[in-house]
Amino acid sequence: MSRGLDALGDRFEACFPAGAPGWRTLGREAEFPVVHDDGTAADVRDLLPLLSRAQPSLRETREGGMLVALRNDRVEYTLEVGRGTLEVVVGPAQDLHELQARHEEARAPLLAAAKARGVHVLGYGIQPVTPATASLMTPKARYGVLLETIGEPWLWFTLTASDQVHVSISRDELVGATNLCNLLAPVTVALCANSPVFGGRDCGAASAREHQMGEILADTFRHGMPGAADADARALVRRLAEQDLLVLRRGGEIRAGGGTFSHHLAKLGGPDAPEAWDDFLLHEHYIWNTARPRSAIGTLELRAACQGPLHESGASAALGAGMVCAWRELQTFLDAELGDAAWPTMRRWHGAVIRHGLAADEPVPGLIAGILDRCETALDARGRSEGRLLAPLRRRLAARENPAQAALSALADGGIRGLVAHAART
């Protein structure tokens, strides 16, 4: 089946444009916890009618009769795994300034709807009080199947809220940029961790989101940093294919998979089987590495950031865009600083920053500053003054305090209600 997987790898690679990268466009998927005054999860389905009335151009998407999304040409509002979390999707945008303006334009009606319902939209990475239970899960069919196949660890998805940025990439840089951005996962976590409180208490990790999600099929590195760099697109697809196949779509219905995807492909008879490509795309959609290429839209998606403070919500997008724009320079920098020990060194640091944020020692003094410098240079080379959007991250680094550490201070000063007020501040 190795040849069959190589054929899939070639097809996957061909989904990205050939040649040198052109002008990079950007997109953003921002997930927001919505809570009551006491920090317990609100039901975001109550907000959808208000959003629809405020924006008549929004079109409904339903699943099994349930309203699951609203979208127009500017924005998409989508129910997340947890019924207390709403995702706001915008893009493609031509630069970070447009991306942020589009995001704020989309977020404003959400904040107004929440205010009308007496609930709070949080710039925070997890539900702070309500536990992960099946009753919190949005009743979409595929979520039920994933609970069946993964078990209770899947329920962490009902709590978490990430801030994902998409950056367009070319075929020639597909593997190099993906490897580099996966390697830089601890930098994103160090600067953008923001989920230290859930279940109503300090959980002992700056990014409980990354810590808990990392427990999902951890032996195969299904979430977060992969085990190692991939040599080429074929190797990338082979790695994905050795993961468990969790779900399949047949006749418009989602059902549980079984075994690895490579085993499933062999049963189909190889990559030329009518179902093979669509089955692979659904399979790889449910592998949650820090950086993952999205073949349908030709982007690299960066996933390590928790949802950040509302008044600094563009910072993680700027970081992700900078990493992709500067990936070659950053790879050279890491090779010089860490050499052959880069992956094991960064993996150890990843564990440290998940727990301690910017209080964790860097592997090499000045490593984060050097990375930010190269990101800023690459962004400014685009000629649109985007590098200045990294300023919140430089302030965090100078203070050695990321959003998680600030959230813990708010909890200490005012309890859960103080944390809610802090995380709802715009």
Feature roles, as predicted:
Residues 307-309:
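Short, catalytically relevant binding-site loops at active-site mouths
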Residues 125-295:
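Loop-rich catalytic cores of soluble enzymes, especially ATP-dependent carboxylate-amine ligases
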Residues 35, 91, 168-170, 305:
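Solvent-exposed residues in well-ordered beta-strands and their adjoining turns
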Residues 1-153, 159, 193, 297-298, ...:
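Terminal catalytic/cofactor-binding subdomain
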